[in-house]
């Protein structure tokens, strides 16, 4: 593609655009530059790409996009916001793939991963080829690709959408993080349905205030365009029980569909019954009333199913098909996942890493726990410190036997993180500290008896632990199974 054609994607810029320069590749990482590359200088949180402009030229870059002055021998085009420019250029370069896809974006503090997997499976069971982008992986049809972030950078994202189209995918479902929205990673993506799950404290190391965090989430709905006169209008699916849904509604001109339990909603659950094996509830919808029996446990699971069914309705999938699919799904890896190894007590691994997420899971366990509740929990290093004492307080308030431990300490001292946590706990409260996460899990398993419940919270599906600069193998599910087998004399 000629540079002058590609630059049609950006309405305002300065610098001369050659009609002869051919662009065969776009990169923001100088290590990925090859001959024919348009190199985009991104001033990031850790690295400033402007410092690598000269290196990009050495490797074969033929033009540069920049915000700040760079002194190189090839054409430089200056823009106000290079992150947003990159998203627009990526969309144009890869042929605006989301205009041909049905695209669903799901945002919120908790529930994004589960809902995205539920919606993807519903659409697939309806006979369509699907794509999925989220916390655990990217998926194109049946092909699984690794992912580093919940929402990839805009170049990777648009390339993935293009590859989905080439593979016959008709509907793509993705988790949309607040970081991605603020950083413009999804700018230029043409969403058909946007889903808001909930908002509770998380990422305040980045957003600083809940107001900023909420505004970040609302960007997805502001991006959901006005399309009153099309056959497929844009739709916002909102949680009627979360007060921040009002903000999301004000941000968009799209049609609104609501779901909820407490407030009146288009998709409303009632008569909810929770057991250790699943949940049942009555569902009111615009097309009739139904009774559901799902294998997932807890009110938060009911919310996730409501969101998935409401989204399926927005995608014109028959209600009976959506219900049949969600009733057949056992759950998502690392989300209230039961570990069975012959023990007489439930061991649950869950990704709950926010105060609200931990509270939801512990409240659900309280519905069926017969005796003691053990919770193994820590907090991530180099992340929102404000939630640490809240997590500890919830643990001691809702579990009989809280055990504080390491999560992903990253560059922080694990003990210092735990000290931050116990600031939220009165001195009289009983808790145990095992800094080593493996030891904490084994302690809980060795203490537990029939009728007790163990929750291992915070890491869920993750099969690694980040300690300093090292990424080591560590899977809560594997560690729990090993501990159980040792207790039972099976290992």
Curated annotation (Swiss-Prot):
Pathway(s) this gene product operates in, as recorded in its UniProt entry: Cell wall biogenesis; peptidoglycan biosynthesis
Post-translational modification: Carboxylation is probably crucial for Mg(2+) binding and, consequently, for the gamma-phosphate positioning of ATP.
InterPro entries noted in UniProt: Folylpolyglutamate_synth_CS, Mur-like_cat_sf, Mur_ligase_C, Mur_ligase_C_dom_sf, Mur_ligase_cen, Mur_ligase_N, MurE/MurF_N, UDP-N-AcMur-Glu-dNH2Pim_ligase
Catalytic reactions of this protein: UDP-N-acetyl-alpha-D-muramoyl-L-alanyl-D-glutamate + meso-2,6-diaminopimelate + ATP = UDP-N-acetyl-alpha-D-muramoyl-L-alanyl-gamma-D-glutamyl-meso-2,6-diaminopimelate + ADP + phosphate + H(+)
ATP-binding keyword on record: yes
Keyword tags: ATP-binding, Cell cycle, Cell division, Cell shape, Cell wall biogenesis/degradation, Cytoplasm, Ligase, Magnesium, Nucleotide-binding, Peptidoglycan synthesis
GO biological process, one term: cell wall organization
Sequence positions that bind ATP: 108-114
Residues the record lists as binding UDP-N-acetyl-alpha-D-muramoyl-L-alanyl-D-glutamate: 30, 149-151, 177, 183, 185
Family named by the database record: Belongs to the MurCDEF family. MurE subfamily.
UniProt function note: Catalyzes the addition of meso-diaminopimelic acid to the nucleotide precursor UDP-N-acetylmuramoyl-L-alanyl-D-glutamate (UMAG) in the biosynthesis of bacterial cell-wall peptidoglycan.
PANTHER family xrefs: MUR LIGASE FAMILY MEMBER, UDP-N-ACETYLMURAMOYL-L-ALANYL-D-GLUTAMATE--2,6-DIAMINOPIMELATE LIGASE MURE HOMOLOG, CHLOROPLASTIC
Protein name in UniProt: UDP-N-acetylmuramoyl-L-alanyl-D-glutamate--2,6-diaminopimelate ligase
Source organism of this protein record: Listeria monocytogenes serovar 1/2a (strain ATCC BAA-679 / EGD-e)
């Amino acid at each position: 593609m000629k540079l002058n054609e590609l630059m049609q994607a950006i309405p305002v810029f300065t610098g001369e655009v050659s009609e002869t320069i051919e662009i065969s590749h776009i990169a923001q990482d100088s290590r990925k530059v090859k001959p024919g590359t348009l190199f985009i200088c991104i001033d990031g949180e850790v690295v400033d790409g402007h410092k690598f402009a000269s290196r990009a030229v050495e490797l074969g870059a033929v033009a540069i996009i920049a915000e700040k002055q760079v002194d190189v021998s090839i054409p430089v085009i200056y823009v106000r916001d290079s992150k947003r420019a990159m998203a627009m250029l990526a969309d144009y370069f890869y042929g605006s793939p989301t205009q041909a896809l049905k695209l669903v974006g799901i945002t919120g503090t908790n529930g994004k991963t589960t809902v995205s997997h539920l919606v993807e499976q519903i659409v697939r069971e309806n006979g369509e080829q699907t794509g999925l982008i989220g916390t655990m992986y990217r998926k194109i049809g049946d092909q699984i690709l690794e992912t580093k972030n919940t929402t990839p950078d805009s170049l990777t994202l648009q390339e993935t959408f293009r590859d989905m189209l080439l593979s016959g995918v008709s509907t793509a479902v993705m988790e949309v993080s607040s970081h991605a929205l603020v950083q413009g990673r999804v700018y230029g993506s043409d969403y058909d349905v946007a889903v808001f799950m909930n908002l509770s404290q998380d990422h305040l190391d980045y957003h600083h205030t809940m107001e900023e965090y909420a505004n970040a989430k609302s960007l997805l709905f502001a991006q959901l365009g006005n399309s009153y006169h099309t056959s497929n209008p844009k739709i916002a699916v909102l949680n009627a029980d979360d007060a921040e849904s009002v903000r999301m509604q004000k941000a968009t001109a799209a049609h609104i569909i609501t779901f909820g339990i407490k407030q009146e909603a288009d998709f409303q659950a009632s008569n909810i019954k929770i057991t250790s094996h699943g949940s049942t509830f009555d569902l009111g919808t615009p097309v009739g009333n139904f009774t559901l029996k799902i294998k997932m446990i807890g009110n938060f699971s009911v919310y996730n199913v409501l969101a998935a069914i409401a989204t399926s309705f927005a995608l014109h999938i028959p209600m009976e098909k959506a219900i049949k699919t969600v009733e057949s799904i056992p759950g998502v890896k690392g989300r209230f996942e039961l570990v069975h190894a012959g023990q007489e007590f439930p061991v649950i691994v869950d990704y709950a890493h926010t105060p609200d997420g931990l509270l939801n899971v512990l409240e659900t366990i309280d519905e069926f726990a017969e005796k003691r509740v053990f919770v193994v929990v820590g907090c991530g290093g180099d992340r929102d410190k404000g939630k640490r004492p809240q997590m500890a307080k919830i643990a001691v308030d809702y579990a009989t036997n809280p055990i504080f431990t390491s999560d992903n300490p990253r560059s922080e001292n694990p003990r210092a993180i735990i000290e931050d946590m116990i600031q939220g706990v009165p001195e009289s409260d009983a808790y145990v500290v095992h800094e080593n996460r493996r030891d904490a899990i084994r302690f809980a398993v060795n203490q537990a008896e029939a009728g007790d419940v163990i929750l291992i919270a915070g890491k869920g599906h993750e099969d690694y632990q980040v300690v300093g600069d090292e990424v080591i193998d560590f899977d809560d599910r594997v560690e729990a199974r090993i501990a159980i087998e040792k207790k039972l004399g099976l290992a």
